[in-house]
C-alpha cells in the first residue's frame, strides 16, 4: 500500500524528506491499509509538548475516511494526529523551518514492516506564476517526447 499526495508536488517545491510514524486507532488503521486517505490539504506542525522543553509533531487535515465495518458515530475524519519522531529530528526540523521559512507537507503514506509510515517533505510554497511555468515545461516535454517517436 502506497498513497501519494500528487497535489503537493504541484503546490510546493519539495526538499528534504523524512519518514515518521503516525498514531492511529484501530478503525483508522484498517481504513488506511485499504487506501481510503486524502492528503490534499494536509500539513504538519511542530508544537511544544506538555512535558517541559520537549516538542511534538502533529499532522493536520489528513482525511482518513471512516472504515465501513466500524462504529462511526463519533468519528472525526480530519482530526489532528500525532507523528512519531525523535526529539533530535524535531529540533533540526524546527530550526530548518524557521530559518528557511519552510513547511512540512505529507507526500506519501505507506507500510513498512507492518507499520503505517508517513513521508513528510520540507517544502516551500510555489507562487501562481511558478505553477504556470511548471505546466508549460511539462507540456513542452510531452511535445518533444511525441516528436521524437
Each language-model region and where it sits:
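Ribosome-associated RNA-binding proteins
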Residues: 1-149
